[in-house]
């Protein structure tokens, strides 16, 4: 059975009959409790416009990967809010070289500082790929921990990220010790084609990495192995949410959820960097 709103099926989410139509439980929740994006936008903009009034070398920390979403977040911080962030990139040993080049080029373009922390997540990635599971949540958690430490060290209050989906009904989340995280893109509901259009005037090039990513070498392989094990993509919840919110058509979503074709050059590069796959 297929959800009549998003791309979930009974294989990936519980489907019920609602007013004569099949609908997944996530879509039902949204219908009953729809997010207020205008309210989200007002909350985020109030914080960021007020940050401009504060002194100091940096107004906030931007969790920066060189991918399209964090680059777009930087564009908004600089051009819309006139803020000076410190961009913090965590190179987990498996960032695409194109992503690092993009990060260097874009931060130079905006004349903002870029801090790159070198880490090694080989064990995490090997474990996830071996088991056919997603490494993304664990990787993101480790990266955010590093970014939070820098934020605390510098005495700053806000971490900005390029996440496109909110925390339920808010784009802001409280972290430890008074630090807050803001998912900057969430209130604006940018579609993919809009994002790429907005990046056209920047020194940023889209890499071909397999999967939806514009910065991570591991993702395509992880998606491939998960698909082999379960018969669907671990991106299903995120993609379904994009469809639910009108940010992605069902046709494009279905294509995004297909098993990726990872270029052999990606496998070769991962092995060269020390990943046993």
Swiss-Prot record:
Native species: Methanocaldococcus jannaschii (strain ATCC 43067 / DSM 2661 / JAL-1 / JCM 10045 / NBRC 100440) (Methanococcus jannaschii)
InterPro entries assigned to the protein according to its UniProt record, in alphabetical order: ATPase_PP-loop_MJ1599, Ni-pincer_cofactor_biosynth, PAPS_reduct_dom, Rossmann-like_a/b/a_fold
One function term, GO molecular function aspect: catalytic activity
A Pfam cross-reference name: PAPS_reduct
Protein's UniProt name: Uncharacterized protein MJ1599
Annotated coiled-coil segments of the chain: none
Domain of life, per lineage: Archaea
SUPFAM superfamilies membership: Adenine nucleotide alpha hydrolases-like (SSF52402)
């Amino acid at each position: 059975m297929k959800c009549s709103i998003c791309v979930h099926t009974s294989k990936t989410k519980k489907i019920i009959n609602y007013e004569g139509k099949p609908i997944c439980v996530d879509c039902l929740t949204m219908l009953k409790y729809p997010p207020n994006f205008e309210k989200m936008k007002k909350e985020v903009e109030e914080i960021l416009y007020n940050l401009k009034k504060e002194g100091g070398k940096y107004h906030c920390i931007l969790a920066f990967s060189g991918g399209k979403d964090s680059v777009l977040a930087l564009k908004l911080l600089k051009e819309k809010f006139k803020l000076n962030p410190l961009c913090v990139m965590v190179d987990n040993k498996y960032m695409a070289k194109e992503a690092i080049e993009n990060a260097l080029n874009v931060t130079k373009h905006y004349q903002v500082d870029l801090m790159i922390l070198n880490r090694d997540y080989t064990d995490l990635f090997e474990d996830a790929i071996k088991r056919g599971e997603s490494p993304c949540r664990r990787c993101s958690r480790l990266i955010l921990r590093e970014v939070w430490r820098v934020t605390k060290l510098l005495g700053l209050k806000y971490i900005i990220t390029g996440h496109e989906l909110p925390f339920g009904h808010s784009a802001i989340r409280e972290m430890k010790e008074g630090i807050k995280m803001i998912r900057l893109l969430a209130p604006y509901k940018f579609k993919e084609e809009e994002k790429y259009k907005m990046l056209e005037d920047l020194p940023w090039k889209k890499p071909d990495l397999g999967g939806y990513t514009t910065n991570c070498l591991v993702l395509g392989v992880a998606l491939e192995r998960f698909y082999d094990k379960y018969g669907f993509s671990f991106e299903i919840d995120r993609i379904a949410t994009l469809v639910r919110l009108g940010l992605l058509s069902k046709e494009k979503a279905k294509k995004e959820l297909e098993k990726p074709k990872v270029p052999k050059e990606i496998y070769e590069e991962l092995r060269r960097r020390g990943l046993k796959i």
